[in-house]
Amino acid sequence: MDSKKIKTLGELKKSGYISKSIKQEIRENLIKRIQAKENPFPGILGYEDSVIPDTERALLSKHNILFLGLRGQAKTRMARQMIDLLDEYIPIVAGSEINDDPLQPISRYAIDLIAEQGDKTPIAWLHRSQRYGEKLATPDVSVADLIGDIDPIKAANLKLSFADERVLHYGIIPRSNRSIFVINELPDLQARIQVSLFNILEEGDLQIRGFKLRLPLDVLFVFTANPEDYTNRGSIVTPLKDRIESQILTHYPKTLETALEITEQEADISEAQQEKVKVSDLIKRLIEQVAFEARGSELVDKKSGVSARLTISAYENAISAAERRAIINEEKETQVWLSDLIGIIPSITGKIELVYEGEQEGPYLVAFNLLERSIRTQFGQYFPNPDTLKKKKSKEAAPEENPYKAITRWFDAGNTLNNYFETKDEDKVQLLYKVDGLHALVKKHFKSASDKENALLMEFVLHGLAAHSLISKKVMEGKIEFKDLMGSMLNIGSAHFSEEDFNEEDFN
């Protein structure tokens, strides 16, 4: 059907156009997508066997949907992508505020216009991009905002009484007729406002200010909410929850590989940054592991969750930290070093909610310790786990069997390595080669690694040994200091720092 050629109701009737509800429309288009083996929600990763099938079943059942999950779980994005399941264009009565179907008008305006002009009633065509409404639920949202109210100014201008239906000012829901309407953070909506949605969900109609009118609206409702309202702002009233046919539980990425894909897809990295800064797979995994460590930490509020935005923001900050260093040192290109990861601390502190014990430790210390735990966890994936070496009895494990003996002995001899944040790449590499046994260890386990990869892995070994308490590590102003444990008894384990050790300027 060429919608551009159809301008009147008569032409629409002759074309054989058949009205259908938005839920039927989405159902039919979804069936076509499934038959064509197309993903109706492209770009949504990690939900292929859970949330997406649940959503497809709900849409095939013509249900309203509640996405229930912690922050940063793509709930709103799922709703927005439903726009692509709508027909490209639908006809409406020209000038209608609520997108009246020309064949099934419901507003006084459309009914009167069709009664007056008949088949000559003008038709407009509405693109699917205009058939999506979204409202963030806040405590100040009123019934008038959502449903509508009497407009005294309109009544005065048109010289109509308040008993006349034409004095109504429609809210955002009636204006979303024949559209998808999303209410984000549903628990934030006051209980009395939630009650006003009962009729729309159950009967498909609404009443405004006691008017005896019935508007059988055609709307697909999608709601988003947290499973527990961790801010104590409110909750979803039970009768409303009962009227939402499908409740779908979202979740965080279950594997590191999925999380890596999401971060790379969502991170906003410019072409100039991509050319100047190279990021190894090791750095990417360390950043992702921080989120997994945070979700399992006793110091982080599990009711709040740890958003995927944490790793996206951290990834961007890590690249920017390396870029800034390269600009300062006038280097044409560089790579992200582990020392650059100190720059992701602000991304962590701003994305986690701490429990009481975490607040006592302080956000910077908790964030730093999460990074340390990430290094500790990933270290065992690349090199022999020092913990297993510690557990061996001395008679079973000769000193030469410890692959880290030469490195720790170098530090035991009183040597110190100062890894400055703004050191040039070549100077950092020369510094790392001074540590006995460090290059040999990396070469043994990564024979085909490039020179840059070797240098990064050498730095990783130092951080990994510090995370396992084989050497000490202390973050100081402008640098990270590595030395032997006996010489740093006050900083055993490298993860125990006072809040005073962190200066706001160190993270900028």
Question: What are these model-derived regions, one by one?
Answer:
Residues 2-257, 268-285, 298-302, 383-508:
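Conserved ASCE/P-loop NTPase catalytic core
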Residues 273-280, 293-370, 382:
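C-terminal helical "lid" subdomain and adjoining coupling/linker elements of P-loop NTPases
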Residues 263, 287-291:
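Short alpha-helical scaffolding segments that buttress acidic/His motifs in well-ordered protein cores
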Residues 59, 82-86, 90, 201, ...:
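Amphipathic alpha-helical interface segments used for dimerization/assembly
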Residues 34, 150, 294, 322-325, ...:
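Generic structural signal for hydrophobic core residues of well-folded globular domains
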Residues 358-372, 376, 380-383, 390-391, ...:
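Elongated, mostly alpha-helical coiled-coil "stalk/stator" tethers of large membrane protein machines
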